[in-house]
Regions:
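Repeated loop/turn-to-beta-strand initiation elements of outer-membrane beta-barrel proteins
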Residues: 43, 75-80, 111-114, 146-150, ...
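Membrane-embedded beta-strand positions of outer-membrane beta-barrel proteins
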Residues: 47-49, 80-82, 116, 152-154, ...
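Residues on the lipid-exposed face of transmembrane beta-strands in outer-membrane beta-barrel proteins
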Residues: 47-51, 65-71, 102-106, 136-140, ...
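Transmembrane beta-strands of outer-membrane beta-barrel pores
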Residues: 51-55, 73, 84-88, 120-124, ...
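Solvent-exposed loop/turn segments connecting transmembrane beta-strands
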Residues: 53-61, 89-95, 122-130, 164-168, ...
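Outer-membrane beta-barrel proteins
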Residues: 71-75, 108-110, 139-144, 160-162, ...
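Outer-membrane beta-barrel transmembrane domain signature
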Residues: 147-215, 219
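Predominantly the C-terminal beta-signal and adjacent terminal strand-loop region
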Residues: 201-252
């Protein structure tokens, strides 16, 4: 419990350093409704993981995992997240992606807030040895539950790309994101998030997910993610990536 109380303070002290050294993974969408006015407890966290293996004539495996931790104050929220996925077939790796990030939110009123978020991503099978993004701006909480929640936010940012061919690129960008959550029943929740990073090569991300609670701590998550890049690297020329995951989740 002492750790849960001290981590937010440490994040506040290290926030400036973290934003400068790393930067949200722009192939994912932050869908946690991190409004401190609606928080039921000072800390919320989850861990989701899924694994698929096949053997015989074809040998393949796929592993996905993600986690989000959020600490709430009276008018602030601090979040850390990470995700990982890799796939192999016949003992050869075909995809491998890792991302970590952090986010802060400050409520100016019950509906208006400021935010800042940053992350680091590596996805070498899609052409990115490293991608760092930092964004900050203004958001509006239009709906705040308990059944329906919706927020929209936007702001400027900067992105640094290091490609697998050795080239690098730094560019300014414009960021916008909308997230909707629908508490369908006591144990079933639907979420839809969309984010856009507008630059010379614009990226659009979407996550559609259904979470079903099994009990107080465990649940199932089905998610469909789409990432579209207007100008993908030459080493990974497809504009659109799609991923469907089914995972078991644990609530902290």
């Amino acid at each position: 419990m002492k750790l849960l109380k001290t981590v937010p303070a440490a994040l506040m002290l290290a926030g400036g350093v973290f934003a400068a050294m790393s930067a949200t993974a722009d192939d994912s969408v932050f869908t946690v409704m991190d409004d401190p006015t609606a928080a039921k407890k000072p800390f919320e966290g989850n861990l989701n993981a899924g694994y698929l293996a096949q053997s015989g004539n074809t040998k393949s495996s796929s592993l996905t995992a993600d986690s989000t931790l959020t600490w709430y104050g009276n008018t602030t929220a601090w979040s850390l997240w990470g995700n990982a996925s890799n796939t192999s077939a016949n003992d050869e790796r075909s995809s491998e992606k890792y991302a970590v990030g952090g986010r802060s939110r400050y409520n100016m009123t019950d509906y208006d807030y400021l935010f800042g978020q940053a992350s680091w991503l590596t996805d070498r099978y899609n052409g990115y040895r490293q991608r760092d993004v930092f964004t900050a701006g203004y958001g509006r909480q239009f709906l705040n539950g308990p059944v329906h929640s919706f927020r929209f936010e936007f702001g400027p940012g900067v992105r640094y790309d290091k490609f697998t061919d050795g080239d690098t690129k730094t560019q300014p960008l414009g960021y916008a994101s909308g997230t909707y959550a629908w508490q369908m029943t006591d144990n079933t929740k639907f979420t839809q998030g969309v984010s856009v990073f507008g630059a010379e090569d614009t990226t659009l991300n979407s996550e559609t997910a259904l979470n079903v609670d099994i009990n107080e701590h465990f649940g199932l998550k089905v998610a469909y993610n789409v990432t579209w890049n207007s100008s993908p690297p030459e080493t990974a020329p497809d504009h659109t990536d799609r991923r469907t995951t089914v995972s078991l989740g644990y609530k902290m």
